Amino acid sequence: MIYTSGTTGRPKGVRRKSGTPDEMDNLYETINQAFDIGPGKRTIIPAPLYHSAPNTYGILCVVMGMDEMVLMPRFDPEDLLRLIEKHKTTHLQTVPTMFIRMLKLPEEERAKYIVSSLEFVVHAAAPCPPDIKQQMIDWWGPIINEYYGATEVGAVSFLDSNQWLGHRGSVGEAMKNC
C-alpha cells in the first residue's frame, strides 16, 4: 500500500500491481537513463517515505546501487542546504513547495552553502510555478528536471531544464516502459 499526497483531499491508500521481473528491469533501465542513479551518487530524501514519489525514488536508489542516502525526518530549507554541502549530494528529489521555501530564505543564508556537488534535481507531485522554476535554474543551473505521474502508475513523462527552457509549460515526453 502506498499513499497519495492528498492534493485532492485526504491521502488515499493505493495498491499497485507488482511488475514481472522483465517489466521491472525495463522500468529500472528507463528510470536510470532519465535520473542517472547508481554507484558514485549520493542523495537526500527530504520528503516522507510513505508518499509514492519519495518511496519509489528511495527504493530505486537502493536497487541501482547509489552510494549514500540521507533521510530527513522533516523538511527544513536551510537544513537541506546544509546537508547537501555536508554530504556532497549529487541527486535530489523535491516538490515545488520545497523550492519555494528555499527561495524564501534570505540571499545571505542561501549563499552560505556550497551546493555545486548537485548534478541532478527532479521535482514532482505538483506543477511548479514558472517563476520559481526559473529562479531554481538560475541558482543551481540547468540541472532541474521534472516528471509527471500518479501514485497509481508512477512516472509517465519527463522534462529536463533545457527542454523546459525551450518549451515552457510542457510536461515533457512520455517515458518508455513506464
Residue ranges and their predicted role:
Residues 1-25:
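Conserved AMP-binding A3 loop
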Residues 2-6, 64, 90-94, 105-167:
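Gly/Ser/Thr-rich phosphate-binding loop
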Residues 42-44, 122:
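Short, well-ordered beta-strand segments
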Residues 75-76, 97, 127:
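Short beta->alpha linker loops
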Residues 19-42, 50-90, 105:
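Conserved AMP-binding/adenylation subdomain of ANL enzymes
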Residues 12-16, 26-33, 43, 81-83, ...:
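Adenylate-forming
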Residues 169-175:
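Short Gly/Pro-enriched turn/cap motifs at secondary-structure boundaries
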